[in-house]
Amino acid sequence: MHFREPGLTHKGDISTESKAGLAGGVTSYFEMPNVNPTTTTNENLTKKFEIASKKSFSNYSFHLGGSNTNIEEIKKVDINQAAALKVFMGASTGEMLVDSIDALNDIFNYSPLIVVTHCEDPQRV
């Protein structure tokens, strides 16, 4: 799901979007890391869980976001906390585009989490 908290709450927040999901029968969500600031550190991941614990009306988890430079954050993520590691291989928010072969190799070799990817080719989309 693409909620917009923190940083982009004029588009929607955890409270409003989880209520909307419940109205449509969605009782659980894994939310994306491309917010502001991005969820590419364990500190920001923890902050999102803190926000959701106060505002969410349904079950939740969050993806840690991959980047070209955050392999050390990825290596130390609590596998019982994050749903997965989200990697954007096409255009994305902020520093979240992973276009370095070395970074991709590190992510796929060392991530303790399942890796989920956006693999679209921006020229074709």
Positions of the model-derived regions?
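Metal-associated gating/positioning segment near the N- to mid-region
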Residues: M1-K55
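Histidine/acidic-residue-rich, glycine-tolerant segments that coordinate divalent metal ions
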Residues: V35-T46, E50-V125
